[in-house]
Every structure is written in structure tokens, then in C-alpha cells.
């Protein structure tokens, strides 16, 4: 199934029911007092995260969601029935944004998370509330309040531990195939990956993490070039970025961009889109070593690392041949283990 990761919807809560003007009409009580009941509250609109849903594709066909109106009050002090709530089901990892204010009003990261996005209107008051010493038979009631209405933007952000970052055709899809059971399309042309792919990497029994292969980025991605910013958001939840670089064409690089300049270009795009992305741990993966002699590949890798002044971990691999891929995954697992230990230690200290 193709991932649809953005949608815009209009939600409208139900109006409250109107209050009733009514009077007691009983035998032997000719001048019965007011007994008009209150209107019922309008239904509200809720968004609920469900782990069994994995795309926003249904919102292409249905974009307007309304909750039920509250029923009007009735005589004999009978309250109107409240309107039914409207439940909208979305994938886990959905961010809800108010389009008018651009405010994030909710981030649904766990199965069963619920978010109230439009509150139903209160029911109107019946005339039984307006009886007084000077007005024994009031004909006054109030109408129900209008329900809230909001235009919302839904953004699905993948819940992955590791994000693969790189130019188109850097070998991200090949790497995720090599280390997980995911089977993204792989071919020797840019933008083979048009939708994000998720793979589960198992290092040992009961020890695994999720890795995301997002479509390749190009210069100007922060402005929407190539496949634009729609996939950069998927990197925001990751705990570690693996920056893949096609290091084989040292004589001019990919489309005339050297391997070191590929890294610098994408760093600029990350900073323009979200400076926090550059603060995430990021490891360099120099791919396609199989296209060079072993000594030549090692020397080329060291040249790139020196040119960048790279101080974080780096690896020389052939994703196609799976050479050097397992040590990366083993190191990633160890990195997450250390992270968990540090977090536990910090909680205990607090």
C-alpha cells in the first residue's frame, strides 16, 4: 500500500439542542408552572490513533466530519438527548495541526491516544429555569450553542529509530533490503523510492530496532525541490541518522557533486528545514565500495572523512554485497542500549 502521509479535513462538532418552553398540564392543576427541559449537548469530534491503520489514504475520499446535533428539550422537564460523538481513526504517529493558526494541537504517538478536536455546543436552557416571584409563567428559553468547527491538517510522521539520509541513488533502499525484511523497489535511477519504507532490523533474539528509508533528497529540498519537504518530517522522530553517500565516483561525483559536497549540501537542507535535525546523532556511511579496489576504496573514504573534518562514527560498506553492513547495525543496537541506560540513570537520579 502506498503511504499517504498528509491530509486536510474539516471537523464540525454538533450544535446544542434548544431549550423548551412548556407548562404543566395536569387535571385539577389549571395554572401549572413551567416545565420546559434543557436541550442536549452537541456531539464532539475526536481523533483516535490506531496501530492497525497505517496510512491517511481514506481522507482523500472523505474530508468533512460532523458530529450529531443535540436534541431539543421537552416538556415535563425532560432533557434532550445528547448528540453522538464523531470518532476519526488515524495511524499512530499522526500530528494534528490547526490550519488557521498553524498550531500543533496534538501528537498521537501511542495506540489508543485520543484528541478532542472540536467540542460540542452546550444545550439551551428550558423555561423552567426562568421562573421567578414576578414571572410565574416565563415563556423564555435559550437556544443551544454552536459546536466548534476547525480546519485541520493531519501529518503522518513515521515512528522509526533510525532514518536513512542521502542523495537519490545513494543506496538507501539497497541497504534497508540488506539489513531487514523490507523490500523497497531498487533500480539504478534517482527517485526509485517514492514513499517511505520501514524495516525491522533484528541484531539478536528479542533485540531489534526500526529503520526508515525515505526518498532521496536533493539541493533545494527544504523549498520543495525533488520530492520536497513532505518526507523530511519523517526524520524528526528518529533517534539516529545514517547519512549514506555514493563514494565510488570520486572523479566528479554524482551529477558533478563530489561525495564531500553531497554531505555538505544535505546538511544545509536539514538546517534550513529544521535545525534540530542537525543536532541528532548522525553517522556517515560511505557506500558502493564494491565498485573500487579495496585499498583504493579505503584511501578514498579516508580522504572524504578528512575533507569533511568528520568526527562522528563512519563506515565503508557495499550495501549490494552486504559487506560491512552488519557491524553498523550492531553498533546502532549498542548505541540505543547506551541511550536507554543513560535515560534510566537520569530518571533514577531525578
Swiss-Prot record:
It holds the Pfam family GTP1_OBG. GTP binds at residues 166-173, 191-195, 213-216, 287-290, 318-320. Residues 1-159 form the Obg domain. Residues 130-143 have a biased composition (Polar residues). Its EC number is 3.6.5.-. GO terms for molecular function: GTP binding; GTPase activity; magnesium ion binding. An essential GTPase which binds GTP, GDP and possibly (p)ppGpp with moderate affinity, with high nucleotide exchange rates and a fairly low GTP hydrolysis rate. Plays a role in control of the cell cycle, stress response, ribosome biogenesis and in those bacteria that undergo differentiation, in morphogenesis control. This is GTPase Obg. It comes from Xanthomonas oryzae pv. oryzae (strain KACC10331 / KXO85).
Amino acid at each position: 500500500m502506498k503511504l499517504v502521509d498528509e491530509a486536510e479535513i474539516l471537523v464540525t462538532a454538533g450544535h446544542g439542542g434548544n431549550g423548551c418552553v412548556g407548562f404543566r398540564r395536569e387535571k385539577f392543576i389549571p395554572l401549572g408552572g413551567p416545565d420546559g427541559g434543557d436541550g442536549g449537548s452537541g456531539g464532539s469530534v475526536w481523533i483516535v490513533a490506531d496501530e492497525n491503520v497505517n496510512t491517511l489514504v481514506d481522507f482523500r475520499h472523505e474530508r468533512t466530519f460532523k458530529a450529531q446535533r443535540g436534541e431539543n428539550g421537552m416538556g415535563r422537564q425532560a432533557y434532550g438527548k445528547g448528540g453522538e460523538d464523531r470518532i476519526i481513526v488515524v495511524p499512530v504517529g499522526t500530528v494534528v495541526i490547526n490550519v488557521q493558526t498553524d498550531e500543533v494541537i496534538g501528537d498521537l504517538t501511542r495506540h489508543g491516544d485520543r484528541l478532542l478536536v472540536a467540542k460540542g455546543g452546550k444545550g439551551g436552557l428550558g423555561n423552567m429555569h426562568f421562573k421567578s416571584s414576578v414571572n410565574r409563567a416565563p415563556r423564555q428559553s435559550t437556544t443551544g450553542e454552536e459546536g466548534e468547527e476547525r480546519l485541520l491538517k493531519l501529518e503522518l510522521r513515521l515512528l522509526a529509530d533510525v532514518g536513512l539520509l542521502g542523495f537519490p541513488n545513494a543506496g538507501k533502499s539497497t541497504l534497508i533490503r540488506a539489513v531487514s525484511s523490507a523490500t523497497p523497489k531498487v533500480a539504478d535511477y534517482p527517485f526509485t523510492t517514492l514513499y517511505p519504507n520501514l524495516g525491522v532490523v533484528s541484531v539478536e533474539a528479542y533485540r531489534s530496532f526500526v529503520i526508515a528509508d525515505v526518498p532521496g533528497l536533493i539541493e533545494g529540498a527544504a523549498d520543495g525541490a525533488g520530492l520536497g519537504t513532505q518526507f523530511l518530517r519523517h526524520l524528526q522522530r528518529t533517534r539516529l541518522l545514517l547519512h549514506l553517500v555514493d563514494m565510488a565516483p570520486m572523479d566528479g561525483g554524482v551529477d558533478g557533486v563530489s561525495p564531500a559536497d553531497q554531505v555538505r549540501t544535505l546538511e544545509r537542507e536539514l538546517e534550513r528545514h529544521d535545525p534540530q535535525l542537525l543536532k541528532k546523532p548522525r553517522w556517515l556511511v560511505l557506500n558502493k565500495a564494491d565498485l573500487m579496489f579495496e585499498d583504493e576504496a579505503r584511501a578514498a573514504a579516508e580522504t572524504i572523512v578528512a575533507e569533511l573534518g568528520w568526527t562522528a562514527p563512519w563506515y565503508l560498506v557495499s550495501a549490494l554485497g552486504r559487506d560491512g553492513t552488519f557491524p553498523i547495525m550492531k553498533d546502532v543496537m549498542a548505541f540505543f542500549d547506551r541511550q536507554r541506560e543513560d535515560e534510566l540513570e537520569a530518571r533514577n537520579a531525578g
